[in-house]
Regions:
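Mid-domain catalytic core of redox enzymes
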Residues: 4, 27, 237-372
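N-terminal Rossmann-like FAD-binding beta1-loop-alpha1 element of flavoenzymes
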Residues: 6-33
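N-terminal glycine-rich dinucleotide-binding loop that anchors FAD/FMN and/or NAD(P) in oxidoreductases
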Residues: 47-74
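Extreme N-terminal leader/targeting segments of oxidoreductases
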Residues: 1-8, 26-27, 49, 377-383
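Mobile amphipathic helical/loop "lid" adjacent to a hydrophobic cofactor/ligand pocket
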Residues: 68-195
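Conserved flavin/dinucleotide-binding core of flavoenzymes
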Residues: 48, 104-107, 325-439, 443, ...
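Glycine-rich FAD pyrophosphate-binding loop
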Residues: 25-50
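Helical element adjacent to the flavin cofactor pocket in flavoenzyme catalytic cores
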Residues: 195-253, 258
Length: 457
């Protein structure tokens, strides 16, 4: 058996797999990390561009920001790795191509009243008045276990909230945070969603944490973990994981077979299920309950994706095709200059699910990527409660789907997977180098007195 404490195969080099591999190796385990892509990091994805002045700039297009209050595992990891961070500006706007409304939060009255005549918009003023009502009723639901488990859509309908509030406030909150289509947002479990909002100070007009971003891009932390690992296999897609009484066997697409004492499967839930050659009934039921949304993403310099009113321009810019929200995908553009503190003449933006009727100017496109994000339903939330059942024997699972789908959730689940194996099949108890397994769930954005959520994973 290689290594003083055994040998573990870790499948997937996103934040969950990287954290698990790092924690296990620090505890004296021989680790082999397998990643299907040639690039490590998953949603920690830093791309490079050259500005008009000839300077190269690092641009994150996946995971962007974190905070000390709700990302304790990630903050601890960054501290250990010596990853430099800086403050980020967090604000969010909504732009409706139907009625022409543009407003932004966390930018004071200038953001909420960014357009001349905003105070003459009756539906908009009613929406602003409905926000504190929503906050109170959401807190009331959380405080009452007997209130049932309504979906967000049913909660809003029962509360008599206006269609304008739903389409111009509530849907942007959920859709921007979880990168889901507006019609999917209404199916989210209300209690689960409100617990997230409450944990991030987003069910009141104050209390949002201070946000930070990694200096030089999130790839900095990925590289610092990778250089500490002894066996990293890039462009090595795993085709099957077989478990047997004496260990596990990992097969890769190039025909290679790796033997290990245990395995951490740190992929999306549906991918993990496909990799298992012998899934148990519990694994089929739990992992099979998760669905994912595919979000085509464009990195570009087309500033027309921002609101026309300069006072409404924000870090997160949500677009509505029509007042009813319209069917289809979430459309949001992240203004990297604000989020990453870029000192450049050019505007750099990341747009999710660009509108084919209002496409990004082709000459301004720098790259295209597709990211997947978990979709939360009553079924997947119920399955999530059963995930600890799967961390038995010689296999453990990790991924952001273990929490709210964000970077902290992936980091925490990776540490927990390492902890489970060290305290189980690898024996000798767990020693994770001081890492804590406490903390609360992930991200959110505050809109000043009007709060909207949204933090890219």
């Amino acid at each position: 058996m290689a290594g003083a404490r055994g040998r573990v195969a870790v499948i997937g080099a996103g934040v969950a797999g990287l954290t698990a591999a790092y924690r296990l190796q620090r505890a004296g385990v021989a680790v082999e990390l397998f990643e299907a892509d040639a690039r490590l990091g998953g949603h920690a994805h830093t791309q490079r561009a050259v500005g008009a002045d000839g300077r190269a700039v690092a641009l994150d297009t996946g995971f962007l920001v974190h905070n000390e209050r709700t990302y304790p595992q990630l903050v601890e990891l960054f501290r250990e790795l010596g990853v430099p961070t800086r403050r980020s500006e967090m604000s969010m706007s909504v732009r409706c191509h139907g009625c022409g409304l543009e407003y932004a939060g966390a930018r004071g009255p200038a953001g909420l009243l960014a357009q001349p005549g905003a105070l003459l918009r009756g539906r908009y003023l009613r929406m602003l008045a409905e926000v504190p009502v929503f906050h109170r009723r959401a807190r009331r639901l959380l405080a009452d276990p007997a209130a049932g488990e309504p979906t967000l859509g049913r909660f809003l309908a029962a509360g008599g909230f206006s269609p304008f509030f739903v389409s111009h406030f509530m849907n942007p909150v959920v859709a921007a945070v979880w990168s889901c289509a507006p019609e999917v947002a209404g199916e989210y479990p209300a209690r689960y969603l409100f617990a997230f909002l409450a944990n991030h100070g987003m069910l009141s007009v104050t209390g949002s944490p201070s946000w930070r971003t990694v200096v030089g891009g999130s790839q900095v932390y990925v590289e610092r973990i990778a250089e500490r690992l002894t066996a990293v296999h890039r462009a090595a897609p795993v085709t099957a994981v077989r478990r047997h009484p004496d260990g596990v066997t990992v097969d890769t697409a190039d025909g290679r077979r790796t033997e290990a004492d245990a395995v951490v499967v740190a992929t999306h839930a549906d991918q993990a299920l496909r990799l298992l050659a012998d899934p148990t009934d519990a694994e089929r039921a739990v992992l099979g309950a998760f669905r994912y949304s595919r979000n085509p993403t464009v990195l570009h310099r087309d500033a027309s994706r921002l609101p026309r009113a300069k006072g409404a321009r924000a870090s997160w810019n949500y677009e509505l095709p029509a007042c009813d929200g319209g069917a289809g995908s979430v459309r949001v553009s992240y203004h990297l200059n604000r989020l990453l503190g870029l000192d450049t003449a050019e505007d750099y933006l990341v747009t999710l699910n660009e509108d084919r009727h209002r496409p990004v100017a082709p000459e301004q496109v720098l790259s295209r990527t597709v990211y997947e994000h978990p979709i939360y339903t009553p079924e997947s939330v119920a399955a999530q409660r059963r995930l600890p059942e799967l961390a038995t024997g010689r296999s453990a699972f990790a991924g952001a789907y273990h929490g709210w789908g964000f970077h902290e959730d992936g980091c925490r689940s990776g540490a927990q997977a390492a902890h489970a194996l060290l305290g189980g099949v690898l024996g000798g108890g767990a020693n994770l180098g001081g890492a804590r397994l406490d903390g609360v769930h992930p991200d959110g954005v505050q809109l000043g007195g009007v709060q909207l959520g949204g933090v890219q994973r």
